[in-house]
Amino acid sequence: MTDTMPTPRTPASAWREMVRGNARFVAGEPSHPRQDVERRESLGTGQAPHAALFGCSDSRLAAEIIFDKGLGDLFVVRNAGQVISDSVIGSLEYAVAVLQVPLIVVLGHDECGAVRAAIDSQQPDATPLPPHIATLIAPIIPAVTRVADEHDGHADAQEVGREHLRDTVAELLESSELISDAVAAGSLAIVGANYRLVEGTAVPDVVLGAV
């Protein structure tokens, strides 16, 4: 029988469930909730996800596994490097305005290939990237530049990743009046977190709203 946990409807309760699920995953004791036939049937006519998650496309960043969630629990948007675009903003606005999620998690991670590509692209002897990849990673370059300027030209990948995560959250707020208004009204929170591949932990770095 499917787990019938009530859908979290406040930012704090939604984040609390994300933290609990991640703790189960880290401990190696996932409950794999809401993944049975009954759950599939109940979702046939609609969805009421607990949260939206915008993360990197990296194959090691499987959101429902990391947070021990089930079918219909998360509205997930992903691209390489978790880079803001019109399609990302539109998808997240849909989650907030139509699905009424109380929480957006922006999830970066260590050892990110997009971050590494952005760093390497700034080297004097860098091989030009294919045009679509170059366009994709362009929003990461400001974080590379800032970190390099602060560390005598050396851009540490983990620090660049953290800076880019903060940039992503800031750009989301600046680009979407709908989302920024929801945060200001208290109906939505945004948590920017970094996922540690080996440990399995999702560590908050940026928190906007009451969680």
Name these PLM-found stretches:
Residues 50, 54-91:
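Active-site cofactor/substrate anionic-group-binding motifs, chiefly glycine-
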Residues 50-52, 101-104:
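Short active-site oxyanion
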Residues 58-60, 109-114:
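Gly/Ser/Thr-rich loops at beta-strand to alpha-helix junctions
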Residues 54-56, 78, 105-109, 191-196:
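Short beta-strand segments
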Residues 2-45, 72, 81-100, 113-211:
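Divalent-metal-activated hydrolytic enzyme cores
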